[in-house]
Amino acid sequence: MSRKPLIAGNWKMNLNHFEAIALVQKIAFSLPDKYFDKVDVTVIPPFTDIRSVQTLVDGDKLRLTYGAQDLSVYDSGAYTGEVSGAFLAKLGVTYVVVGHSERRQYHGEDDALVAAKAAAALKHGLTPIVCIGEALDIREAGDHVQYNVNSLRGSLAGLSAEQVGKVVIAYEPVWAIGTGRVASAADAQEVCAAIRAELAQIANADVAGSVRVLYGGSANAKNVGEIVAQEDVDGALVGGASLDGEQFAQMSAIAAGGPLL
């Protein structure tokens, strides 16, 4: 089944709203419209930047989309510091990242909470990018495939087959995030293929064939081509490289079959 690649730029806690506008303008200027027929491109800024990004995207009729880095499992109420999926939907958000390794590591999020957040995103018409990935000790022990399969199942628990068909999965080996170490294309394919096989068990073969599985972990313009060429890798969740508008545009073009012309 043909799956349109997705290049998603996770800005993490970087850039104020003025800087966000400048970066989106740079990406839009650097990536001609023709590429958007072959690749979906989204930026995922901090909450405080989303309204500014929305105004720019809508005003200039840009073809890229934008997302959020997290959401609450609650719709509203006395939950100080939380941001509801209902609020994000009103801002025109397309994607929302759930279960990023930094949320799991620094905020104690587990698979059950990730599954609840994925369900909350879907409830409000948002596409969750569900993140899973192993630490270095798990990989070195040779347990990385089973670990990710188990985490996938836990992070999608309670979702129907139809709902699973609406998610994006991001495989992000924790040992490769922000370290400059990159999983080889074969490493990425091994786990992403296992994820797809497990999706067939969780849902069905049609869902498994349609869900996009991304690689995340020090992806950049030099390595993204080989990674997305793998049969079961459908794009990248990009960290640091997404803060460079020209490089992010180049990565998007490569995923579309590039190069950037």
From Swiss-Prot:
Gene3D superfamilies: Aldolase class I. Pathway: Carbohydrate biosynthesis; gluconeogenesis; Carbohydrate degradation; glycolysis; D-glyceraldehyde 3-phosphate from glycerone phosphate: step 1/1. CDD domains: TIM (cd00311). Transmembrane segments: none annotated. It is an enzyme of class 5 (isomerase). The active site is at 100 (electrophile), 172 (proton acceptor). Its main location: cytoplasm. Keywords: Cytoplasm, Gluconeogenesis, Glycolysis, Isomerase. Substrate binds at residues 10-12, 178, 218, 239-240. It catalyses: D-glyceraldehyde 3-phosphate = dihydroxyacetone phosphate. Its EC number is 5.3.1.1. It is found in: Cytoplasm. InterPro entries: Aldolase_TIM (IPR013785), TIM_sf (IPR035990), TrioseP_Isoase_bac/euk (IPR022896), Triosephosphate_isomerase (IPR000652), Triosephosphate_isomerase_AS (IPR020861). One of its GO terms (cellular component) is cytosol. GO terms for molecular function: triose-phosphate isomerase activity. The keyword Isomerase applies. It holds the Pfam family TIM. One of its GO terms (biological process) is glyceraldehyde-3-phosphate biosynthetic process. The keyword Cell inner membrane does not apply. Involved in the gluconeogenesis. Catalyzes stereospecifically the conversion of dihydroxyacetone phosphate (DHAP) to D-glyceraldehyde-3-phosphate (G3P). Homodimer. Belongs to the triosephosphate isomerase family. This is Triosephosphate isomerase. It comes from Mycobacteroides abscessus (strain ATCC 19977 / DSM 44196 / CCUG 20993 / CIP 104536 / JCM 13569 / NCTC 13031 / TMC 1543 / L948) (Mycobacterium abscessus).
